[in-house]
Regions:
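A helix-coil-helix interface module used to build multimeric assemblies
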Residues: 1-155
């Protein structure tokens, strides 16, 4: 399964959104989006990249052939180059412009930053809900007397 992040802790505690966000599908589709952005920018700067090549790249962002990636990675021993090759198989007219002039860190590091940003935005939204719920709870029970504790002992009024 490539659409969910897998680990013992994640399967117990992570939300469906976070499992999908940190999945292989999201990571490698983000790589492909970055390659599309790179090709588009290079085209605008005058490199010999056609609009048809960019369009073909855009058409194949989500259809990742993981069997092809795995086979190619065993041959070249490089995850990014295995994905470049596989993307080129899906978009043959654009194969020569995928990753043009980029380093591996262009896709790996930037994809991580995009995923972390999205995760933090999600966490922020969830924290806002928690804070609102706690504020409502505190307001609702503000007049309720409670037993106080200090140093793990209940307070005794003398």
């Amino acid at each position: 399964m490539k659409n969910q992040y897998e680990s013992p802790l994640a399967s117990r505690y992570a939300s469906k959104y976070m499992l999908e966000l940190f999945s292989s599908d999201t990571r490698y589709q983000t790589w492909r989006r970055l390659w599309v952005s790179l090709a588009r920018a290079e085209r605008e700067l005058g490199l010999p990249i056609t609009g048809q090549q960019v369009a073909e790249l855009e058409e194949h962002i989500t259809d990742i052939d993981y069997d092809c990636v795995s086979k190619r990675e065993k041959e070249v021993r490089h995850d990014v180059m295995a994905h470049v090759y596989t993307y080129g198989q899906a978009a043959p007219s654009a194969a020569g412009v995928i990753h043009l002039g980029a380093t591996s860190c262009y896709v790996t590091d930037n994809a991580d930053m995009v995923i972390y940003r999205d995760a933090l935005q999600y966490i922020r939204g969830e924290l806002i809900k928690v804070i609102a719920n706690l504020a409502g709870f505190a307001d609702r029970y503000k007049a309720l007397p409670t037993l106080g504790y200090t140093h793990y002992l209940s307070l005794i009024h003398i």
